[in-house]
Amino acid sequence: MYGIEILVDEHKNIVEFCKSMKSMCCSIIEGNEVDANLVKECVAFGKTYADHLHHGKEEKILFKIMLEKLGPVADKLIRNGMLVEHDLGRLHMNELLEAADRYEKDPSTLNKLDIITNAAGYATLLNRHIGKEDEVVYTFAERALSAEDKERVDAETKAFDEDPENKANVAKY
């Protein structure tokens, strides 16, 4: 199923990003300086690639169709699980950006802690979240959606990926 294959491939990129975020946190803990611009680049990737591009496809296409077609099990899984975790990731990214801005004005230990806390929290959240999607959500969709619904997911995913703004953002990252 093309739509899910793309999402799984994007997960691989996001996992690598999460490794980089944790490495950045370790570097700060080991006494290296905080690079606020690097932190802001991480936020840009998180908001653009992981959230807008990847979560956008999930929320606007796959999850939407699952909610329409697969009943209360999908409703609980998507609304009470995946969407809540997407929102938690957004919170971490917003808090991380605010911490980087504060650190530039006041390079205190507290602001450094907020950078580490939100970067590591985001990476941990996304790694666990990706496991749930790959092992539970996507397999449920592949098993339970009709052939027609799978074709709809694939077609809408291709259209999303062909959007010029989305193509430009994928090329950027």
Stretch-by-stretch model annotation:
Residues M1-Y173:
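Small-residue-biased structural context
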